[in-house]
From Swiss-Prot:
Family that this chain belongs to: Belongs to the RNA polymerase beta' chain family.
Pfam family, one: RNA_pol_Rpb1_1
Molecular function GO terms recorded: DNA binding; DNA-directed RNA polymerase activity; magnesium ion binding; zinc ion binding
Annotated organism of origin: Streptococcus thermophilus (strain ATCC BAA-491 / LMD-9)
EC number of this enzyme: 2.7.7.6
CDD domains, sorted: RNAP_beta'_C, RNAP_beta'_N
Entry-linked Gene3D superfamilies: 1.10.132.30, 1.10.150.390, 1.10.1790.20, 1.10.40.90, 2.40.40.20, 2.40.50.100, RNA polymerase II, clamp domain (4.10.860.120), RNA polymerase Rpb1, domain 3 (1.10.274.100)
Chain residues that bind Mg(2+): 450, 452, 454
Protein name as catalogued: DNA-directed RNA polymerase subunit beta'
Keyword set includes Magnesium: yes
Gene Ontology biological process terms from the UniProt entry: DNA-templated transcription
Keyword check for Transcription regulation: no
Length: 1212
């Protein structure tokens, strides 16, 4: 058996007839499949056991030889070799075709490879192949042109004219094969290269395309005539099975029908040739054979597809590979796995962060082999069969064994759709009753799970290695941070937030206010016995909490706080200051001094002088988690999270918050506000009727009036709300709902959008407490429906975007420590107009500097060169007033097929520097794709007359950027660096002209009349700067500026879209994706290299090709950078396996076969396809080639190290 993990590379070429014969175990001569009576395969048929091997293991067809001991013997009666039945999946047969047949992939693909090789048009080829015309193969002495076409009539006339045998002309694939055999590749290539030196325009384009194909044949060693088949391979029978159904009927693969047609026509052709039938009949039969083979290879590519019962097109060999149901995506990239189950999930509030509840019945089934092994080991049963019976009977003793087996054996839980890597995490199983899986409430956010009927799948890692990885890398307690932005992803929500909010509230004049306690226990006892309320402000001796980081001047004093806050602080690690207020200073520095009592001071006076502090909201809890993680890392954080969860649930239960209709307040002056708005609208309409304003102005004024009315009601609501109102508490704490929900309950619902997206002028005046009228209800349904459809469409769009992103970046892996590049990227804050979309501080954190950063005033070095910037350093840089910093960036990294550690920086998911082997491309793709569903689908109209273009935003804009399409609402850019000297308006053509004066000359740009200008007369502009509002076309920018400018522009654009929707994504993820779009260059002039002009190639391959030429003193090739959209970039990847499994499978494989492409299995996808361990993480060569050391060797190495250290110190 071939060991997949030893594979170096995989090559695909055209198969020569000898190759096909060498694969084959015999010729299939009859169209029969199996005998209808005996159900045994027919001899020489499509399922023949002589050719393809036995149907039963170690048993010949007639039954003379049975058992493994006859292995390898060929039966003398039936001729079947005694071997495993599995060989029926690998042994091929063949069909000897009685006439050559063209391969439809090479004749029909775009561009037609046959056509380019012969320099004939695809239409001419079609006429010849399908017997509609003759082609002149050898004109001999006649004046006929070689390769010219003759109709049947012309052919006969020419024969009469020049005499029989005076020239050779044929029809059918046979003629094409003869022509292909005549092609002299070397001579043709030399001729084309000469032609290229002078050719221009269309002629040059065609020559380049022909040269490309001929060169591919020449370099790969494929012969052009192999594009025509004389012998057809037959797929192994178990890959096109025939199975008996219950009713005695048979279900067979479509391929069998297609093969049957080929065999029937081939046999008929053989008979006709034997009988010497008239030419026209033979011709017709040959054409039918050609069509049968076409249908077998790619049914439906030419003409109407061959259909089966119910006029359903039959699935041909090509269809077996294509699409989501094809071989690649269905069976190779995603397989169904054993040792897995799925069930509904329920909440497990008592679980620890690293645990999940698994139903007993499920666990016994999943861990069956482990339990059976243990039963035999404990001698409850003599052998495995007996042990299996024990488990299936449900013997009492198996449950104790199960408990022992699952200890320390993590399982993986996955929820579909798995949008990012947090969609699969490992947990330790805890056995529970019932049939639902129990999930820890804090991991719900990562899975995007809720308990309204969601289901999850469970998988068991089997090998020791898999268990170790699950435990060390995938355990849920390790995944505190989100890989997309490095912020905690496990923040408490809903009840947990509410409980902690309630617990940390403060209130005036509640029972027990001003009491002083000696320690925590006394305070808690007083609370339990009803002497003091949770929210009462009381005093407690600082010295009773010795492990907190108090300042010197705070010791031996009394702290003013509440019992709730004492309880809340008791779960917080002792390294964090006592949290008395929600400020950042309190969290990072120390508890403010104003809460401490000097000896002899009256506590009541201090309490009265203090403001009432806001309770801890969801945002503050998130900050606390982040701070604890920063200081104490994973283990302590996950333990703290569990304590926070328990506390939250406990106190939200105790608080007993309920919502009734009386809790929705009534706004006293609602009617006045609405009447005023009505009055204003009436005035606007009057003004419109008098002709004082346009229809557009009136519409804008009316909608604005109603918006203002709604805002006024909302403002009034906020002013009058009672902080103890349960709805307000839920909203304020961030547990559920927001001000907009609240104002719909108590204010007014406001304006609604009509089905066409335009906002209707009639607002909904009622709120949900009062109830809506029938008409209002009807209006509001439009929006609801649109919301649902948008979400459904968006999910599909976003999923497809993620798939394309993953595909283009899947081979980007951290390959080395430092690439040693001499380039860096200058970064500053990203701004959109006046507002900052991403601050410099956010952009600096977790990157390596390229040059040292100096203080702009004092000149002192804040951060040295090639240093990892921490949060504190980033803050120091920004505080010093530095506006731009040169950092190491993915854009400028020199590593081939990946990135180096220094150019990438910190791994956002762990907060530490990234490790070699991290699959950063996939992480980047997931980080950009996962929030895709949160982006909007709409194209905004910029209101009325301001501009005539719509600005695309949300998901469509992201797709536009990554596919490098020409944007809607394109901005005009300048190609000259200089000053804007005049902007003249031309009313006649309805355009403006902008004149830019530069050092090298004057630039004149025509701008639409309605476009909004971004520049004024006298402004300085740089090359590639936008003169008008709108999006710059990146391909145009690439022509005017360099690659780095385009990369920086695309990065800023992507960030603008995501940030405007409140989604944060680390720069480095976008950098990884954008770099993949600019990996290729197009060769302009090959110089002395053997590159072809017009070829697309990887930058690193281009540099390599030039390196040798430059060293030997030749003329290097020149090239131009190319910007590819992600779909195009995925298809242009060097790995044909990866490209074929993405899209356009047949096109990719046709091209790869002609070029004889080798796939070096560098990316992740190609390794998954062939089943090899992926070259990322622990699958990287440097982690796999580790030799275990014997104990004594370790000692020797340690001694050597000690000796070396002694030597070094003595040299000093």
């Amino acid at each position: 058996m071939v060991d997949v993990n030893r594979f170096k590379s995989m090559q695909i070429t055209l198969a020569s007839p000898t190759k096909v014969r060498s694969w084959s175990y015999g010729e299939v001569k009859k169209p029969e499949t199996i005998n209808y009576r005996t159900l045994k395969p027919e001899r020489e048929g499509l399922f023949d056991e002589v050719i393809f091997g036995p149907t039963k293991d170690w048993e010949c067809a007639c039954g003379k030889y049975k058992r493994i001991r006859y292995k390898g013997i060929v039966c003398d009666r039936c001729g079947v070799e005694v071997t495993r039945a599995k060989v029926r999946r690998e042994r091929m047969g063949h069909i000897e075709l009685k006439a050559p047949v063209s391969h439809i992939w090479y004749f029909k693909g775009i561009p037609s490879r046959m056509g380019l090789t012969l320099d004939m048009s695809p239409r001419a080829l079609e006429e010849v192949i399908y017997f509609a015309a003759y082609v002149v193969i050898d004109p001999k002495e006649t004046p006929l042109e070689p390769k010219s076409l003759l109709t049947e009539r012309e052919y006969r006339e020419k024969l009469q004219e020049y005499g029989h045998g005076s020239f050779v002309a044929k029809m059918g694939a046979e003629a094409i094969q003869d022509l292909l055999k005549q092609v002299d590749l070397e001579a043709e290539i030399a001729e084309l290269k000469e032609e290229l030196k002078t050719a221009t325009g269309q002629k040059r384009f065609k020559a380049v395309r022909r040269l490309d194909v001929l060169d591919a044949f020449y370099k790969s060693g494929n012969k052009p005539e192999w594009m025509v088949l004389n012998i057809l391979p037959v797929l192994p029978p178990d890959l096109r099975p025939m199975v008996q159904l219950d009713g005695g009927r048979f279900a067979a693969s479509d391929l069998n029908d297609l093969y049957r047609r080929v065999i029937n026509r081939n046999n008929r052709l053989a008979r006709l040739l034997e009988l010497g039938a008239p030419g026209i009949i033979v011709q017709n039969e040959k054409r039918m054979l050609q069509e049968a083979v076409d249908a077998l290879i790619d049914n439906g590519r030419r003409g109407r597809p061959i259909t089966g019962p119910g006029s359903r097109p039959l699935k041909s060999l090509s269809h077996m590979l294509k699409g989501k149901q094809g071989r690649f995506r269905q069976n190779l990239l995603g397989k169904r796995v054993d040792f897995s189950g799925r069930s509904v999930i329920a909440v497990g509030p008592t679980l620890k962060m690293y645990q999940c509840g698994v139903p007993r019945l499920m666990a016994i089934e999943l861990f069956k082999p482990f339990v059976m092994r243990e039963i035999v080991a404990r001698e409850y049963a003599g052998n495995v069969k007996a042990a299996k019976r024990m488990v299936e009977r449900g013997d009492e003793r198996i449950w104790d064994i199960l408990e022992d087996v699952i200890k320390e054996h993590p399982v993986l839980l996955n929820r579909a759709p798995t949008l990012h890597r947090l969609g699969i995490q490992a947990f330790e199983p805890v056995l529970i009753d019932g049939k639902a899986l129990r999930l820890h409430p804090l991991v719900c956010e990562a899975y995007n799970a809720d308990f309204d009927g969601d289901q999850m799948a469970i998988h068991v890692p089997l090998s020791e290695e898999a268990q170790a990885e699950a435990r060390l890398l995938l355990l849920a307690a390790e995944h505190i941070l989100n890989p997309k932005d490095g912020k905690p992803v496990v923040t408490p929500s809903q009840d947990m937030v509410l409980g902690n909010y309630y617990l940390t509230m403060e209130d005036e004049g509640r029972e027990g206010e001003g009491m002083i306690f000696k320690d925590i226990d006394e305070a808690v006892m007083a609370y339990h016995n009803g002497y003091v309320h949770l929210h009462s402000r009381v005093g407690i001796a600082v010295d009773s909490m010795p492990d907190k980081p108090w300042k010197e001047n705070q010791l031996h004093k009394i702290l003013v706080t509440t019992v709730g806050k004492i309880l809340f602080n008791s779960i917080i690690p002792s390294e964090i200051p006592y949290l008395q207020e929600t400020t950042n200073e309190n969290l990072t520095d120390s508890t403010p001094d104003k809460y401490f009592l000097e000896p002899g001071q009256d506590i009541q006076t201090v309490i009265d002088s203090l403001e009432i502090n806001a309770p801890f909201k969801k945002k503050h809890l998130g900050n606390i988690i982040a701070e604890i993680f920063k200081r104490l890392r994973t283990t302590e954080t996950s333990a703290f999270l569990d304590r926070l969860k328990d506390l939250g649930y406990y106190y939200s239960t105790l608080a007993g918050l309920t919502v009734g209709i009386a809790d929705i307040p009534v706004i006293d002056n609602k009617q006045e506000i609405i009447d005023a708005a009505h009055h204003r609208v009436e005035e606007i309409n009057k003004a419109f009727r008098r002709g004082l304003m346009t229809e557009d102005d009136r519409y804008v004024a009316v909608t604005t009036t109603w918006r203002e009315a709604k805002d006024a009601l909302e403002k009034r609501l906020i002013e009058t709300q009672d902080p103890k109102n349960p709805i307000v508490m839920m909203m304020d704490s961030g547990a559920r709902g927001n001000i907009s929900n609240f104002s719909q309950l108590a204010g007014m619902r406001g304006l609604m959008a009509a089905p066409n997206g335009r906002i209707m002028e009639l607002p909904i005046l009622s709120n949900f407490r009062e109830g809506l009228s029938v008409l209002e209800m009807f209006f509001s349904t439009h929006g609801a429906r649109k919301g649902m459809t948008d979400t459904a469409l968006k999910t599909a769009d976003s999923g497809y975007l993620t798939r394309r992103l993953v595909d283009v970046a899947q081979d980007v892996i951290i390959r080395e420590d430092d690439c040693g590049t001499d380039r860096g990227l200058v970064i500053r804050a990203i701004t959109d107009g006046k507002e900052v979309t991403e601050t410099l501080e956010e952009r600096l954190f977790g990157r390596y500097t390229k040059k040292s950063v100096k203080h702009p005033e004092t000149g002192e070095v804040i951060v040295g060169p090639d240093t990892l910037i921490t949060e504190d350093m980033a803050a120091a840089i920004v505080n010093a007033g530095v506006e731009e910093v040169t950092i190491r960036s993915v854009f400028t990294c020199k590593t081939r097929h990946g990135v180096c550690r220094h150019c990438y920086g910190i791994n956002l998911a762990t907060g530490d520097a990234v490790e070699v082997g991290e699959a950063v491309g996939t992480i980047a793709a997931q980080s950009i794709g996962e929030p895709g569903t949160q982006l909007t689908m709409r194209t905004f109209h910029t209101g009325g007359v301001a501009s005539n273009t719509d600005i695309t935003q949300g998901l469509p804009r992201i797709q536009e950027i990554f596919e490098a399409r020409n944007p809607k609402g394109e901005a005009v850019i300048t190609e000259v660096k200089g000053t804007v000297i005049e902007i003249e308006e031309d009313a006649a053509t309805r355009t403006k002209k902008v004149f830019v004066q530069g050092k090298t000359g004057m630039g004149e740009y025509v701008v639409p009349f309605t476009a909004r200008m971004k520049v004024e007369v006298g402004d300085e502009v740089h090359r590639g700067e936008a003169l008008t509002e709108g999006s710059i076309q990146p391909k145009r920018l690439l022509e005017v500026r360099d690659t780095l400018s385009v990369e920086t522009y695309l990065l800023a654009e992507v960030q603008k879209v995501y940030r405007s929707q409140g989604v944060e994504i680390g720069d480095k993820h976008v950098e990884v994706m954008v770099r993949q779009m600019l990996r290729k260059v197009r060769v302009m002039d090959p110089g002395d290299t053997d590159l072809l002009p017009g070829t697309l190639m990887d930058i690193s391959d281009f540099t390599d090709a030039n390196k040798d030429i430059v060293i030997s003193g030749g003329v290097p090739a020149t090239s131009r950078p190319v910007l590819l959209g992600i779909t195009k970039a995925s298809l242009e990847t060097n790995s044909f396996l990866s490209a074929a499994s993405f899209q356009e499978t047949t096109r990719v494989l046709t091209d790869a076969a002609i070029r004889g492409k080798k796939d070096h299995l560098i990316g992740l996808k190609e390794n998954v396809i062939i089943g090899k361990i992926i070259p990322a993480g622990t699958g990287m060569a440097r982690y796999r080639n580790i030799e275990p050391l014997a104990v004594n060797e370790v000692e020797v190495i340690e001694n050597i190290a000690v000796d070396e250290a002694i030597v070094e110190s003595s040299e000093d």
